[in-house]
């Protein structure tokens, strides 16, 4: 939806004549496209799926869900990075903990702080997914439920490191010290 929003904006300023009478494209901006991404992130991902996993991890057998939890943190960091790159300052404080804000008027977190949170999420996940930190007990097997990497922890760690590099490149001109952490 982000790409569609930007395409509509660019198309509005471009000249496109189809050659047919009354067939010129319309580039009317529809709030639903932008709102869809926002709603999907906060309603579907943050408050239902991610929140449920966080609660399961903290109140059930941590060893059993260890791998699934930290893989999900990596994926959530990826979604969160796209959200802040699209909207800038966003509400994060409660959602990243898997909680609902106490009222509807949530506090927006400045984008610089969101990036700090992203680096913390990724650093923690990378550390916890190293072989020596994995619990000795049998893990919840993601297997076919992991559509990206089939539950391969090494591939998820590589993705997390790649995402860290991408985020570091994004902030390198604004905050070189943060980029080098």
Q: Whereabouts are the PLM-identified features?
A:
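Short, well-structured alpha-helical patches and their helix-loop capping segments
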Residues: 110, 114, 152-157
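Carbohydrate-binding/catalytic loop surfaces
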Residues: 100-101, 142-152
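Aromatic-residue-lined binding/catalytic grooves and analogous aromatic/hydrophobic interfacial grooves
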Residues: 4, 119-142, 153-181
